[in-house]
């Protein structure tokens, strides 16, 4: 059976509570992720974002509450970072081929979609932050996900590189018709087609559209008024395109950042 109704959640968290010893990491978390939606989770360091992600992926069992995965759920996961042994270099091509049950044609499709053909013989250890994220995203797509989970995908990537990654994520979502759950430490740039931002600080502090959350008193208390006034939206209508190092590399489908409240 295919998941084709927006009324059926891909994942549902019901009254989740996680306790480590005497410390409550999460409590009263209720969250549903529907097909073809984009959800961004933000929150302060130590607020439980990583714990929530582990529970959602069933890598950690909650102390209380229920995690429901739809039977047809296919997750593509992009971790915040991976550890690579420096003494054992591995090429991008070899790294992608490590995933079992994947054909060369499927790897080639992912390489072309993420525009990383020029990197296939490069050492993983020598990739820039933006290049690494492209490769990790390509690997996640090999699972043909209907839910793409991105853990801090913009970490270590400069502003222009972030815009380029958002472009790729948007294109990926359109091609695969998948939902996206993105975990971030801030709201400086969010996808323009984000349906909901969820702010976590051990519990759900506030949730809603990016504009609503950035002006919520609880969010401002956590992140500061100046931060809340500098939320920008990636949009996918452009007049030029950057590479991962921020250089303008071609004219065609492009990107821009529309800033909210600060006139940038």
UniProtKB/Swiss-Prot annotation:
GO terms for biological process: response to zinc ion. It is an enzyme of class 7 (translocase). One of its GO terms (cellular component) is plasma membrane. It is a peripheral membrane protein. It is found in: Cell inner membrane. Keywords: ATP-binding, Cell inner membrane, Cell membrane, Ion transport, Membrane, Nucleotide-binding, Translocase, Transport, Zinc, Zinc transport. Residues 11-226 form the ABC transporter domain. It catalyses: Zn(2+)(out) + ATP(in) + H2O(in) = Zn(2+)(in) + ADP(in) + phosphate(in) + H(+)(in). ATP binds at residues 43-50. Its EC number is 7.2.2.20. InterPro entries: AAA+_ATPase, ABC_transporter-like_ATP-bd, ABC_transporter-like_CS, Metal_Ion_Import_ABC, P-loop_NTPase. It comes from the Bacteria. One of its GO terms (molecular function) is ATP hydrolysis activity. Belongs to the ABC transporter superfamily. Zinc importer (TC 3.A.1.15.5) family. The complex is composed of two ATP-binding proteins (ZnuC), two transmembrane proteins (ZnuB) and a solute-binding protein (ZnuA). Part of the ABC transporter complex ZnuABC involved in zinc import. Responsible for energy coupling to the transport system. This is Zinc import ATP-binding protein ZnuC. The gene is znuC.
